[in-house]
């Protein structure tokens, strides 16, 4: 649940008159999402009104509101027999009622949201009550392989729920002597030191190019640089560091992050930047690179990204790559990247197969709970 924001200063709310007192009302909304995959969808019983329910879910471990999704594969009634019906059901509720908006969509073979439908307002739910769409999607369109909505005969539904909580009022009075504290510009100011090479005390040599930097900042941000300058190493004695395995453009992006906490060109060089972040123990930059690479996972590059993640101990990226390969196994196994990995990294192939087997055979063990970014 997000923290209630402070109200904007009255002088910034309007260029008009300023009242002596004010009130700011925040209506709290808890948002969460749920993904439900139905394997072997074409084998569902086709009687009209037949119901399939998901397991229950909530916004978190401490949330007492429990929900589930309900599907009628062949419609709810005679009117909707040519459609799939989809509903959000409130299973248990400690209150007399709650209000919530919802959005349903289908994830296609690429994991993209399609055929989205959402409620136009927050509906009133009581325990045992459901709301949804009797005519969510035509069955003939859903079952047509050309539309790519049932890869490997799996129907994957994605649901986003927004639950309306209580409202909170914050009130106060205006004073004539309003003090406005300026925003912190530390990142910009440190970035200026790097860009202008002011007050530098060490030189970093990268592929024949020299960059002036500040030992204190490098040591504070990177345990690797800290070790170089702290001990009686040649880098500490000469205040000069030779860097041979990072390209200059990648190095500059890494230094921008060290000084400012930002990497504006990360998406263009996420793979190389991940390697640099791993070498210099820049954990936050490493996770930022993992996130960017996750966003660009595809059938063509899944094997290469899995190898990269394994090489640099990028655990979150590795998990996402394995899950992606499992979901698109029939396509990924035909790529040149996968065939190369079979020869060069057989242990990763074995890991992917083990994960695929456990996903398809849940009876082999208890269900695993899916539970950071600093």
UniProtKB/Swiss-Prot annotation:
Region feature (Required for nuclear localization): 71-191
Pathway: Protein modification; protein ubiquitination
Variant or mutagenesis effect after changing residue 131 to A: Strongly reduced affinity for substrate proteins
Gene Ontology cellular component terms for the protein in this record: Cul3-RING ubiquitin ligase complex; cytoplasm; nuclear speck; nucleoplasm; nucleus
Alphabetized GO MF terms: identical protein binding; molecular function inhibitor activity; ubiquitin protein ligase binding
Region annotated Important for binding substrate proteins, chain positions: 123-133
Chief subcellular location: nucleus
All residue ranges annotated as the MATH domain in the record: 31-161
Outcome of substituting residue 25 to A: In NSDVS2; dominant-negative, increased BET proteins stability
The protein's name in its UniProt record: Speckle-type POZ protein
Organismal lineage: Eukaryota, Metazoa, Chordata, Craniata, Vertebrata
Gene from which the chain derives: SPOP
């Amino acid at each position: 649940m997000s923290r209630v924001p402070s109200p904007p200063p009255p002088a910034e709310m309007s260029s008009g008159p300023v009242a002596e007192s004010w009130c700011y009302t925040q209506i709290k909304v808890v948002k969460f999402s749920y993904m439900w995959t139905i394997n072997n969808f074409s084998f569902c019983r086709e009687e009209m009104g037949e119901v399939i329910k998901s397991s229950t879910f909530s916004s978190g471990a401490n949330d007492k509101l429990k929900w589930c999704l309900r599907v009628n594969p062949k419609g709810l009634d005679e009117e909707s027999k040519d459609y799939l019906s989809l509903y959000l059901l409130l299973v248990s509720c400690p209150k007399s009622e709650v209000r919530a908006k919802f959005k349903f969509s289908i994830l296609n073979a690429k994991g993209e949201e399609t055929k989205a439908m959402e409620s136009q307002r927050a509906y009133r739910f009581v325990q045992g009550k459901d709301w949804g769409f009797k005519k969510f999607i035509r069955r003939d369109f859903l079952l047509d392989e050309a539309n790519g909505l049932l890869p490997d005969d799996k129907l994957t539904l994605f649901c986003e729920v927004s639950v309306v909580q209580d409202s909170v009022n914050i009130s106060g009075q205006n004073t004539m002597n309003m003090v406005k504290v300026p925003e912190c510009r530390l990142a910009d100011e440190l970035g200026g030191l790097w860009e202008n090479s002011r007050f530098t005390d060490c030189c970093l040599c990268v592929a024949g190019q020299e960059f002036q930097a500040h030992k204190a900042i490098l040591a504070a941000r990177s345990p690797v640089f800290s070790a170089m300058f702290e001990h009686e190493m040649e880098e500490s004695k000469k205040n000069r560091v030779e860097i041979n395995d990072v390209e200059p453009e990648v190095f500059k992006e890494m230094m921008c992050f060290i000084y400012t906490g930002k990497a504006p060109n990360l998406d263009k060089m996420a793979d190389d930047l991940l390697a640099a972040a791993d070498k210099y123990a820049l954990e936050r930059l490493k996770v930022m690179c993992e996130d960017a690479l996750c966003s660009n996972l595809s059938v063509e590059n899944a094997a290469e990204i899995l190898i990269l993640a394994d090489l640099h101990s990028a655990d979150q990226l590795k998990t996402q790559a394995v899950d992606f390969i499992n979901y698109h196994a029939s396509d990924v196994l035909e790529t040149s990247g996968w065939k190369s990995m079979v020869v060069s990294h057989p242990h990763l192939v074995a890991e992917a197969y083990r994960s695929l087997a456990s996903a398809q055979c849940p009876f082999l063990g208890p269900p695993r709970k899916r539970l950071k970014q600093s």
